[in-house]
Amino acid sequence: MARRKSTASTPDPTVAALLQTLNPHAAGIDVGATELWVCVPPGARSSPCSSAPGVPTVLPPHVRRFGTFTADLHAIAAWLRQCQVTTVAMESTGVYWIPLDDLLESTGFQVLLVDPRQVQRAPNRPKTDVHDCQWIQRLHSLGLLTAAFRPEEPMRVWRSYQRHRANLIEDAGRHLQRIEKALEQMNVKLPEVVSDITGLTGMSIIRAIVRGERDPQALAKLRDRRCKESAATIARALQGTWQPEHLFALQQSLALYDYYHEQLQACDRVIEEHLKGLALPEVPALEPTRRVRRRRDNEVTFDARQRLHHVTGVDLTAIEGIEESTALVVLSEIGTDMSRWPSEKHFGSWLG
């Protein structure tokens, strides 16, 4: 039986005629790790370009391939200006788009960052990089692409700091797991008698072990008076085998755990300084909270409640279930401009 010819790659001319070009000076860019394919409006005037190695010898004059070095990014911006492009659409692929986006925005282009799923869902999408950038350009010129949400530039800086801070916490957590592993390999049952080994009792005992203390009775005396287990029970749990290789692993893991917490404190100082620059004018200080609680291991080292109040003008921690750490992360991701969503229902839908 003869195969039916597919018409998926050929747009219906009747439908195409009904679509109006809304962005006549739009370009489309297909972003990759090693190359960037750029398509400007067909008919845009530009100087001729010789094909780069590995690039098809026959390319439409409005399509070019660039590398991803900084000089290549500047070359893209120069070509777009030459072609009188004012707005550029690209997919948010990994982190490869960030340097080009920053450069284009800083040089006056309007950049439309698009969720890749939006472009993929559009029918008739081609499968090659050469055609992909043309497809993005065409969709953008017809006004069929919607910008992905991005907070304002100061908020994006804050978001980067917060995400880096989360990575530091994750790295510190890995070394805490290695501390627990080394203790278990020496049959030191500290986690069984102390609910949180990063607390006062747990860390006092671990640091004493690293300093050379092996006597279970002496180690048990380091327990905090609020510890539920008795000194005798803790002493029995601390009768370890003390193999040198596991002691060495414990020593190094503790040093790395401390190092990442030092980096956390440095990160907190940078975040606090950045929040000072985001503060609204003439916002009165909050009254001190009556709640008294012990500071948690990974909490920020500055008064986040006050800083957030100066940024937003309201006390976000007054919302039930919202603590300082939660408010810091959420606000750094979405910013303070709630007008981006028509209503709280739209905001909730965007959150998923």
What does each model-found stretch correspond to?
Residues 1-352:
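A detector of single, family-specific signature residues
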